[in-house]
Each structure stands twice: as C-alpha cells, then as structure tokens.
Amino acid sequence: MFIVAVHEWKPEFEITVTKEMIGGFNTLLENKQPLGIKLLSTHMRSDHGAFCTWEAPGLGELENFFKKFGPTLLKATKFYPVMQAFPATVEYELSLLKMITDLASK
C-alpha cells in the first residue's frame, strides 16, 4: 500500500520535528524500521512542512512507526492512502475497470 504523508508543523516545533526526522532517517538508513515500511520520497516545503511517500503493509503500521520515532511529527501529519496512476500499475488498471463496470451497471 502506498501512503502520502502531509506534514505541517508550527514553527515552534521545528527543532523537535527536525530531531525526530533525524532519528527516523537514521532508523531507515540502518534498516531498523518495521518489516514492509519504506520511505520512497520526501519533498520539503519552505514553510514548516513536507510531503512524503511511503510504502507500508497498512496505515496502522505506518502510524505505529511514527508513534515510536516521531510522536510530535505524527500530531502534525495527515495520511492519505493512494494508488499509483502513472506509470500505470495493475492495481490502478483494475480500479479503472471496476469504475467502468460500476458506471455501466447503473
């Protein structure tokens, strides 16, 4: 499952969040994260935020990872399960076919 995490923290939490990010990144670099959790990309914003794309077995597993390694960041994060549309994946193609058949049966 792919999950986009939208992080938006207040300026007064910048140092705390940065320390949590360092700890989390080190955990990932040392391959000590829970099985199946992978950070695919991080895009930083200039206004105390970031967008990250994760692969995880489920939303609960990713939230538990954040509870352990980034509790302050977790409070400033919204998670969105997503599906890769381009390049197209089998899951995306199947979702389109399902949508088409659902619309056709109405």
List each language-model region with its residue ranges.
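Short S/T/G/P-rich N-terminal loop/turn motif that feeds into the first structured element of a domain
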Residues: M1-G49, P57-E61, V82-K106
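Short amphipathic alpha-helices in soluble, non-transmembrane regions
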Residues: G23, L62-P71
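Glycine-centered loop/turn motif at secondary-structure junctions
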Residues: G36, G70-L73
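Conserved short beta-strand edge segments in small beta-sheet-based binding/regulatory domains
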Residues: T72-F86
